[in-house]
Amino acid sequence: MHQVLYYQSPIGVLKIKEENNCIVGVHLLTESEEISKTEVESKCSPLLIKACTQLTEYFAGERTSFSLPIKFTTGTPFQHSVWNALRNIPYGETRSYEDIAVAVGNPKAVRAIGQANHNNPVLLLVPCHRVINKNGSLGGFGCGVEIKKQLLQLEGVL
């Protein structure tokens, strides 16, 4: 069984999904997506409430790491290794796609790192926004480069 909570953040509405006491998804809704009335429950789980609290603290600049259980229910073993490596990038720091490729033991997989970032199911908690190009340019971001820039500014990187 899963529960969903919609959270209004400074970057837009985040859909947070929990399954079996683990966060399995944090997704930024696009303008064309709507809040699913069938998924909204009147009572939220303690974990979803904790997730909202921690996200509020993060966006207020009061939290630099998340202490929420995460489980990857999608993706390949390679993508899981990338997402776990991303969780080790500290707040206020960035790594290049090449750095992550080296960290997962596949230095030539730079493009695959970018694809894994694009498929990251747990936005913010798995900080794919902290991965930039080797030359220091921001690179891509599934939610748009402006949001990536906003998150890196929040963290004091830019």
Whereabouts are the PLM-identified features?
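Basic nucleic-acid-binding alpha-helical/helix-turn surface characteristic of O6-alkylguanine DNA
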Residues: M1-K108, L154, L158
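Short clusters of hydrophobic/aromatic residues that line enzyme substrate/ligand-binding pockets
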Residues: L68-F72, I113, L138-F141
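Regulatory, non-catalytic segments
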Residues: K108-N120
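Short Lys/Arg-enriched helix C-cap and helix-to-coil transition segments
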Residues: L124-V131
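…primarily DNA-binding HTH/wHTH and HhH modules…
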Residues: N135-L158
